[in-house]
């Protein structure tokens, strides 16, 4: 619908929510035509009404008429189907009455499969008033109810489409600010696939329409306020992230409740589809969407060599894990819609603590197995998880009681027809408990399941490499949780006033999941049982249990009346044990632990029945799962415990019911009590003689309470054992929904096995009209198929149990019928030919003998087989022991050789240490000696240098004195020039030269001696360096030997010696 079609707009917050929080509705995407302006205030001044055309009625009608120009929606194809008309069930209070036209019309039915919104609204048969009693008389049009004389006050954009406060505020604003209103007629459909229409009251033409699945919320004004005669509904605007509220006013206030009741009826009802709808459905965009159901199960080591599924707390929806226990992750992937895709393999199972984790934070687990399940419906991946790994430390520490942790699991799959791998990501809550805590809870579900929607795009032929290449590429993968997180609203609800000005939200119940009539019986174990219970009832039961625990041997007085109304599901496990008298059953618990270790002769029958017990229940449907394993143990233990009866067909159903409410040990104890104390095992004894007595009693009760049905059964030759055998042997647990089964067990444990007659008569009485119309085959089919399906509705089951409880069947009457039966049997026995009786008894004994012989042969064969297997195991063990002995001797010899080698190496190492220490001391002494010699020579050289310098200085001083004296002497001055040299006297010169040559020769001799001493010193230094190099060479050889022996400590010692020696050598140089 165009934005122009809205009568008025109120500026609200721009934080509009884009999607709806329900599976029932389509995705709302953004259309950027108009964006609501931001409203930072909350008063009426800031949220004023803006009416198109300044309040002109003609302009208003024109704008509303534009709605008819909207393009057709993609999710509603043009196919039209006949819709079965359903009458409106309403209350006849006030001046309103219902009238449906006789003409049947054709409505367009959307092909999108929607789950109906939840709502609980009481529906009572209406009492028709006269048509002229009110101008608001509904008129049926297009399978709908039409209400006239309504005033349309306008519409506005809202940010919180399910907020009652926001809706009432908008209703008040629109009512107070609307000056010119528009009279309309409102057409409300009777089914959830219909469309709400606004009609012109004059011309009966359509002004606007709103599909029911787009209407999110209905509300009416509070009593005592000006808006008490108004109602409104919010709808998701087509192709925009806008939610709009439409407000109406009724001339008669009482009409508001009738209109909201019509909306409630539309929410609840679903039109019956004709067979043509399946064949005429065109291809939708969903044909490229493949839905997968992915389940996660966590198993822990139970200490017995097996892995058992951990329990799941339904209140917190979290797994309960034990700290430090090895675990396994099991993933079940099952495709639920579209063409089947072949899963080729799994190449990765990953785990990480936390929520919304990155791919880099995921840690790979070791894969143990992958492949199709035994039934071929799902692909199973199993991986081992070591919680002690540092990566998983967060989920291996005990969690406080008031907190939970998140854990993310991912599985990567290769699908044959898909071009790239697909990853399914599961986020779950977990709580870590102490490893010593016993996790016994009768939870029916120990796995978590998530639905994924994989959208694929087919690759064109020219884009493929070859014909065998993949056919699809992934467009997007989205989980159901992600869809819900993007949605902003819950399922539609209707608000109705209560006393005063208060109003309450009444959610609509899910649509009855009615299946088409077929010959398939209802699967056992069907029907979800809610743990919700009124607080007052829980308080009453709490007080009763407190009193009961004070004296467990005496039942409280009000117990029977409370049990008749049903025991709260959360308390059934405890109450059943108290009713059965299992408060002191330690001996049975210990007995059970011993019995499960023994072999049962009826093992094959038990295994066969286990696979057929409660296939519709999640806890028992998996072959080899925890549920079937526990059920097998209980049945096997009882077959060994009760040797006279053993296991009889049907006991598994009763055991399964008990196992859903208590651990194995307690379930076994209650089963024993029911079989022995309540007399159920008597039905299986003496060729079912007591069971036939029960059939006779039932037929006599039918003759008294339902004589016409009794006579009809006689006419069609239908006997009680043909339809009631399963009722008595399984206590109604085999075919009926679980909430009805649990209630029957409540009554049986409280009042005894005679309750079966009450329930059986109740079933026959409520089905009398149908059974009277059947023949022999039809009656059997009715008991097998139609009768259990009739009680899929919990309301029908409650009515049946009320009828059964109100039936008064005295024990005196049952005793009387029992005596009649035994008298009749005695008469038959007396009238019977003794020869025939003996022949029959003989045949029975022969059959028993043959059966025992067969069992003997089977046991003998099993014994021989066991002996052969044990002999084989013993031979294998002996061979393995011989091999281990040989290996042990070889290992001992290797150990002796290794010890000798160790001693030899230790001796060599000690010798090498001593040699190195000796050479090191010698080298240190020589280095010290050389150092002292070098120091002495350095001192001598320095002294000679100082002495030479002193002599030169003294000579210069003496020459200077002589020159001064010569200059002062007039006679001698003539012999010397200005530079101090002799002018011409050769003799003097010779004398002086001679003296100078002698002095030089003396100095040269002294210098030559010093050079000789220095050369000798250098020679000694070179010899010392040669010795040091020789020592270093010896050290290198020793180091190589140590390295060859791989003695690291000696290597470090030699390295330190070498380093010290090298440093000292350099200092010496």
UniProtKB/Swiss-Prot annotation:
The modification Phosphothreonine is found at residue 996. Residues 142-298 form the PID domain. The modification Phosphoserine is found at residues 42, 360. Residues 489-506 have a biased composition (Polar residues). GO terms for cellular component: centrosome; cytosol. One of its GO terms (molecular function) is GTPase activator activity. The record marks 649 as: Glutamine finger. It comes from the Eukaryota. CDD domains: PTB_Rab6GAP (cd01211). The keyword Cytoplasm applies. Residues 510-520 have a biased composition (Acidic residues). Residues 566-752 form the Rab-GAP TBC domain. Residues 1-79, 482-527 are annotated as: Disordered. It is found in: Cytoplasm, Cytosol; Cytoplasm, Cytoskeleton, Microtubule organizing center, Centrosome. Keywords: Cell cycle, Coiled coil, Cytoplasm, Cytoskeleton, GTPase activation, Phosphoprotein. Residues 798-1047 form a coiled coil. Residues 7-22 have a biased composition (Low complexity). InterPro entries: Kinesin-like (IPR022164), PH-like_dom_sf (IPR011993), PTB/PI_dom (IPR006020), Rab-GAP-TBC_dom (IPR000195), Rab-GAP_TBC_sf (IPR035969), Rab_GAP_TBC_domain (IPR050302). The record marks 608 as: Arginine finger. SMART domains: PTB (SM00462), TBC (SM00164). May act as a GTPase-activating protein of RAB6A. May play a role in microtubule nucleation by centrosome. May participate in a RAB6A-mediated pathway involved in the metaphase-anaphase transition. The arginine and glutamine fingers are critical for the GTPase-activating mechanism, they pull out Rab's 'switch 2' glutamine and insert in Rab's active site. This is Rab GTPase-activating protein 1. It comes from Pongo abelii (Sumatran orangutan).
């Amino acid at each position: 619908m165009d934005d122009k079609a809205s009568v008025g707009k109120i500026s609200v917050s721009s934080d509009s929510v884009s999607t709806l929080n329900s599976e029932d509705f389509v995705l709302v995407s953004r259309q950027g035509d108009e964006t609501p302006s931001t409203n930072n205030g909350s008063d009426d001044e800031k949220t004023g009404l803006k009416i198109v055309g300044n309040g002109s009625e003609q302009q208003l009608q024109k704008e509303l008429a534009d709605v008819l120009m909207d393009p057709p929606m993609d999710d509603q194809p043009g196919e039209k189907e006949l819709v079965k008309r359903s009458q409106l069930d309403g209350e006849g209070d006030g001046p309103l009455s219902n009238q449906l036209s006789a003409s049947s019309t054709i409505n367009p039915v959307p092909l999108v499969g929607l789950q109906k919104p939840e709502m609980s609204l009481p529906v009572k048969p209406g009492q028709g008033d006269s048509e002229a009693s009110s101008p608001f008389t509904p008129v049926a049009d297009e399978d709908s109810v039409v209400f006239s004389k309504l005033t349309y006050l306008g519409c506005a954009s809202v940010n919180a489409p399910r907020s009652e406060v926001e809706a009432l505020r908008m209703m008040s604003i629109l009512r107070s600010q609307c000056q010119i209103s528009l009279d309309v007629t409102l057409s409300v459909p009777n089914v959830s696939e219909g469309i709400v229409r606004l009609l012109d009251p004059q011309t009966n033409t359509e002004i606007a329409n709103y599909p029911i699945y787009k209407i999110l919320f209905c509300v009416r004004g509070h009593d005592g306020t000006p808006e008490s005669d108004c109602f409104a509904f919010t709808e998701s605007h087509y192709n925009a992230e806008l939610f709009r509220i439409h407000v109406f006013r009724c001339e008669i206030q009482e009409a508001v409740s009738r209109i909201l009741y019509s909306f409630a009826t539309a929410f609840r009802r679903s039109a019956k589809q004709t067979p043509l709808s399946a064949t005429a459905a065109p291809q939708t965009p969903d044909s490229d969407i493949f839905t997968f159901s992915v389940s996660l199960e966590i198993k822990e080591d139970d200490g017995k060599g097996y892995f058992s599924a951990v329990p799941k707390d339904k209140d917190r929806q979290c797994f309960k894990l034990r700290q430090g226990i090895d675990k396994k992750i099991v993933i079940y992937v099952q495709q639920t819609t579209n063409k089947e895709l072949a899963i080729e393999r799994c190449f990765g199972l990953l785990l990480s603590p936390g929520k919304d984790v990155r791919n880099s934070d995921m840690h790979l687990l070791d894969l143990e197995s992958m492949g199709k399940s035994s039934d071929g419906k799902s692909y199973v991946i199993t991986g081992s998880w070591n919680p002690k790994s540092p990566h998983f430390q967060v989920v291996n520490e005990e969690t406080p009681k008031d907190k939970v942790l998140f854990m993310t699991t991912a599985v990567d799959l290769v699908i044959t027809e898909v071009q790239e791998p697909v990853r399914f990501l599961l986020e779950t809550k977990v709580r870590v408990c102490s490893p010593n805590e016993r996790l016994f809870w009768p939870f029916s579900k120990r796995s978590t399941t998530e639905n994924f929607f994989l959208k694929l795009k087919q690759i064109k032929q020219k884009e493929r490499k070859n014909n065998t290449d993949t056919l699809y590429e992934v467009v997007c993968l989205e989980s159901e949780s992600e869809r819900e997180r993007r949605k902003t609203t819950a399922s539609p609800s209707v608000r109705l006033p209560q006393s005063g000005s208060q109003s309450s939200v009444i959610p609509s119940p899910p649509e009855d999941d009615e299946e088409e009539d077929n010959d398939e019986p209802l699967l056992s174990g069907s029907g979800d049982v809610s743990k919700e219970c009124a607080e007052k009832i829980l308080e009453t039961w709490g007080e009763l249990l407190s009193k009961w625990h004070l004296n467990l041997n005496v039942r409280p007085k009000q117990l029977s009346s409370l049990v008749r109304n049903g025991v709260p599901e959360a308390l059934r496990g405890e109450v059943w044990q108290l009713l059965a008298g299992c408060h002191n059953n330690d001996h049975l618990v210990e007995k059970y632990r011993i019995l499960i270790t023994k072999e049962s002769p009826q093992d094959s029958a038990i295994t066969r029945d286990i696979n057929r017990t409660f296939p519709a229940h999640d806890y028992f449907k998996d072959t080899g799962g925890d549920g079937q394993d526990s059920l097998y143990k209980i049945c096997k233990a009882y077959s060994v415990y009760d040797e006279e009866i053993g296991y009889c067909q049907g006991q598994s159903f009763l055991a399964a019911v008990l196992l859903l409410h208590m651990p194995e040990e307690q379930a076994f104890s209650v089963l024993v009590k029911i079989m022995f104390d309540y007399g159920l095992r008597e039905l299986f004894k003496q060729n079912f003689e007591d069971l036939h007595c029960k059939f006779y009693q039932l037929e006599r009760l039918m003759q008294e309470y339902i004589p016409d049905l009794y006579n009809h059964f006689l006419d069609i030759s239908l006997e009680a054992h043909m339809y009631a055998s399963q009722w008595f042997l399984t206590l109604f647990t085999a075919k009926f929904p679980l909430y009805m089964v649990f209630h029957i067990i409540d009554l049986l444990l409280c009042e005894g096995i005679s309750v079966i007659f009450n329930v059986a008569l109740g079933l026959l009485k409520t089905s009398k009209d149908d059974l009277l119309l059947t023949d022999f085959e039809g009656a059997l089919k009715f008991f097998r198929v139609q009768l259990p399906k009739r009680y899929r509705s919990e309301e029908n089951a409650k009515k049946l149990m009320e009828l059964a409880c109100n039936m008064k069947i005295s024990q005196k009457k049952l005793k009387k019928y029992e005596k009649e039966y035994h008298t009749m049997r005695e008469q038959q026995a007396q009238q019977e030919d003794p020869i025939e009786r003996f022949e029959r008894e003989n045949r029975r004994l022969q059959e028993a003998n043959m059966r025992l012989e067969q069992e003997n042969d089977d046991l003998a064969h099993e014994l021989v087989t066991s002996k052969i297997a044990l002999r084989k195991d013993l031979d294998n063990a002996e061979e393995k022991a011989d091999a281990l002995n040989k290996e042990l001797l070889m290992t001992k010899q290797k150990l002796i050789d290794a010890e000798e080698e160790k001693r030899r190496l230790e001796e060599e190492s000690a010798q090498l240490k001593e040699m190195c220490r000796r050479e090191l001391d010698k080298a240190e002494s020589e280095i010290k000696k050389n150092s002292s010699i070098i120091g002495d020579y350095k001192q001598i050289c320095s002294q000679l240098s100082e002495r030479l310098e002193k002599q030169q200085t003294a000579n210069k001083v003496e020459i200077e004195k002589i020159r001064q004296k010569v200059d002062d002497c007039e006679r001698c001055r003539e012999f010397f020039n200005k530079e101090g040299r002799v002018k011409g006297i050769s003799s003097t010169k010779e004398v002086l030269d001679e003296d100078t040559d002698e002095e030089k020769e003396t100095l040269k001799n002294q210098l030559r001696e010093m050079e000789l001493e220095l050369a000798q010193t250098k020679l000694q230094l070179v010899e010392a360096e040669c010795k040091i190099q020789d020592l270093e060479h010896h050290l290198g050889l020793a180091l190589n030997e140590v390295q060859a022996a791989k003695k690291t400590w000696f290597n470090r010692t030699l390295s330190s010696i070498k380093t010290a020696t090298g440093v000292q050598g350099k200092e010496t140089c």
